Amino acid sequence: MKKNLKYYLKNKLTNKDLTFVPSSFDVVGDILIFSEFPRKLSKKEKVIGETILKTYPHIKTILKKTKKYSGKFRTAKLKVVAGEKRKEAVCRENGVLIKLDVEKVYFSPRMSSERKRILQLVKPNESVLVMFSGSGIYPLVIAKNSECKEVYGIEMNPIAHKYALENVKKNKLENKIKLFLGDVRKIMPKLNKKFDRIAMPLPKGGENFLDLSLRYIKNKGIVHFYDFLNENEFYKAEEKIKRVCNQYKKKCK
């Protein structure tokens, strides 16, 4: 958005109310999502939503998060503030189209640059595994934009998996992507396969699956592990990795 949202609301809200207007939001396709919407503006949310719709015609639905990410699928509750009463979106990222329900499937558009970084690291003929593959965004961008041999994806959320299957077909990548529904601890042993690269894009609790990734990574393979920490706490992630590597007698760097 070219100008700060407050600029377009200055004639519709009091100066005091303007100070509470959220400055950050996510856009997934034609849906705009406020992660944090102040209670003090609850009576003004319709005005704010309608203003966004009039100012930015490409936005069709405004949502606000009413419950933070929770549960085993890490999903959030969302409320329609203005516009079309739907939560399903189609967006384009790194050359692929992806369809999903933003309330029923975990998806972070803010990780787009990270997904691009990963795909640029993939070498020709690599076998890649994406644990917790969601609606398929990681397998899709890797398969579409790299010379990998294949990408496997495992997801426990049946709704996300259903979207992933549809997205693979939509992007005509059936020949490079193989998707599995279920618990990674049950699926991975059945694959009877090791990988050159394993991505673990789990927003919370990834350390509980590090042991699994180390068992199925090839020698000199690469595991992409994620942990959300403050800058002065990065050492904690390193300690988690080293502890598991030592446990399984793996060299890591």
Which positions does each model-derived feature cover?
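SAM-dependent transferase fold signal centered on methyltransferase-like domains
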Residues: 1-253
